[in-house]
Amino acid sequence: MTTDVIQWLLESREPWTRYRTLLDLLDRPDDDPQVQTARAEMLAHPQVQTLVSEAAAWPGYALKRHNDAKHPIHKFSTLADFGAYATDPGLPAAIEAVLAHRSPEGALQTLVNIHQRYGGTGEGMWTWMLCDTPTLLYALLSFGLDDDECVRRAANHLASTIDENGWRCVVAPGLGKFRGPGRKADPCPIVNVYALKALSLSPDLADSPATRTGVEMLLGHWKDQKERKHYLFGIGTDFRKLKYPFVWYDILHVADVLGRFSFVHTDPRFREMVATITAQADEDGRYTAASMYRAWKGWSFADKKQPSPWLTFLALRIQRRCGMG
């Protein structure tokens, strides 16, 4: 990690990048004047204020596919990635809207539209699946709500849904026989990513049998990428492309989540994954998106022609966590 690239991040016009760089790469305390200034500028930034407004309009519209990058659920997770707090302007109302819909099991619910050909009604209904509820849980935990009783119950419920080979496609009991594609006994790679990301923020569950099983599922998938492909989730050229926000199953998302667990840092499978990312840096140590979500056009991480400060920060943080930077 060179001084030049760090300075480039600190001179970025992205206050969220400056804020996280100071905290995560330079270990500045929260009360550091530069940290506080960057944070204030982040919250005042028009793009961030738009994210907050879209989150506050929860549920926005019924979710039909979980890789819909423009859905408000991914505005929540991006605000969490940036470092928003539950008390930040606009977020209390958004959080209240999320907590207003919880299942009897404790899971946070999303307004979902399941097509009739998949056993749904074709209309919006409040329910949960393991490919949406962990993302909401991640956001609320990141916002600092780990002591909230509803949030703790949601975390415990998520941990309880683990199976012997990782998290599988599990949905609310009210959805009957509905489940996602693939073999019933197979783990779902993206569910394991979402679940691990959420539970990494739970003081009681971050290092638990559930998280260790989920981590092994993802590392095993990387190791066996040529021998086995989980339905919809191959590890090929597209998987290796740097992409943000963290919506779907790709290398930066997976490595960022795995890197949250210290017991992974020396695993050769993880380090090989990180090396695949670092090989994509340019001569100045900067990273450029190789793929993008059109719904996020206008953000640096959705520009395939110019290096992105935020993508560069994410890559450097992964390296720093495991001592490879």
Model-identified regions with their sequence ranges:
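Preference for long, amphipathic alpha-helical scaffolds in soluble/luminal domains
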Residues: M1-G325
